[in-house]
């Protein structure tokens, strides 16, 4: 197997902006692109390989063909043949809805699906004008929650953050959240497209209709635990990995490289994904496969990868994630 790039799946949304297409240097015309699905095995939105011997095959077909060689033997068994992560870039020109995602148990019971634990890495904040919501800032009961939804005051219970490039937020299933206007970010999440929309600022869609809310479904999906700080704190460093998140669903680190680095994955029984956010680099694997990676691109390295040599062109910043 060889390092895989996929064709992006662009999603126009009510709240989408204009940054994704130039960021990814795409030659296409599409308005209000809110999301680019970089690597996806969501039914109906399976990523298609862009180049090489497997060009034209989608991720589901790759899973059927390569199995543990692609994702790792234990991952293949654990996730029953499904690719476990969904990778996105998200550009919010307007606020997204206040929402929550169910955990594995509730999602399987209701939707025969995995839950959705996710994380965000802020790439740009529109000159300091971006914010988001993450978690409850005060204790509320399910009944109080229902009352606040009814009175359109749920935002008063949420922790609001002004964000800067490099900020990180970990969002376990059950945590209420919303991406705010001005945020441009990378999102790593479980392979799930289940979202319970809690509040949508009384917006109407292109047909003039209020968007559907999931008030009852969300009530018992919410984790009502309150924390003092929902931001992930870390110390940025150059030319070494900085771990951001480690949870049962993914481990993610950030790299800011100015010099060549050799990555040893020989003991890792998992695929590895690089999500490039700034600059460019050339990556060569242990079989001699060489691939160029630039800002806006995501690359999937199969579980058969033993080691990688990463040579930055000047400086490069990317996220590394695996299961």
Stretches found by the model and what they are:
Residues 87-88, 96, 118-121, 160-161, ...:
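His/acidic/aromatic-lined binding-pocket segments of jelly-roll/cupin-type domains
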Residues 1-140, 200-228, 252:
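Transition-metal
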Residues 82, 90-95, 104, 125-128, ...:
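Ligand-binding loop in jelly-roll beta-barrel domains
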Residues 196-268:
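C-terminal amphipathic alpha-helical segment
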Residues 158-170, 285-304:
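Short acidic-glycine-tyrosine-enriched beta hairpin
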């Amino acid at each position: 197997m060889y390092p895989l790039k996929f064709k992006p799946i662009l999603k126009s949304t009510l709240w989408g902006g204009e940054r994704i297409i130039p960021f990814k240097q795409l030659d296409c015309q599409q308005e209000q692109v809110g999301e680019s699905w970089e690597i996806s095995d969501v039914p109906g939105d399976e990523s298609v390989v862009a180049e090489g011997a497997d060009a034209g095959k989608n991720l589901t077909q790759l899973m059927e063909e390569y199995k543990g060689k692609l994702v790792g033997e234990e991952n293949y068994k654990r996730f029953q043949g499904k690719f476990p992560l969904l990778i996105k870039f998200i550009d919010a020109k307007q606020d997204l809805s206040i929402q929550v995602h169910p955990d594995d148990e509730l999602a399987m019971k209701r939707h025969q699906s995995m839950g959705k634990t996710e994380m965000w890495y802020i790439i740009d904040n529109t000159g300091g004008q971006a914010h988001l919501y993450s978690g409850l800032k005060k204790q509320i009961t399910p009944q109080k929650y229902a009352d606040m939804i009814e009175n359109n005051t749920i935002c008063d219970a949420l922790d609001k953050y002004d964000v800067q490039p490099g900020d990180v937020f970990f969002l376990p299933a059950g945590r209420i959240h919303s991406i705010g206007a001005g945020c441009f970010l990378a999102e790593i999440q479980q392979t799930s497209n289940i979202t319970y929309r809690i509040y949508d600022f009384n917006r109407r869609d292109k047909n003039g209709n209020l968007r559907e809310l999931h008030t009852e479904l969300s009530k018992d999906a919410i984790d009502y635990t309150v924390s003092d700080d929902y931001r992930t704190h870390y110390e940025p460093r150059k030319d070494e990995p900085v771990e951001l998140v480690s949870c049962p669903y993914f481990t993610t680190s950030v790299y800011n490289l100015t010099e060549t680095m050799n990555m040893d994955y020989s003991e890792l029984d998992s695929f590895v994904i690089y999500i490039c956010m700034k600059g460019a680099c050339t990556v060569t694997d242990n079989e001699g496969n060489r691939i160029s990676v630039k800002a806006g691109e995501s690359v999937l390295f199969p579980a058969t990868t033993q080691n990688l040599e990463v040579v930055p062109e000047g400086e490069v910043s990317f996220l590394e994630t695996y299961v």
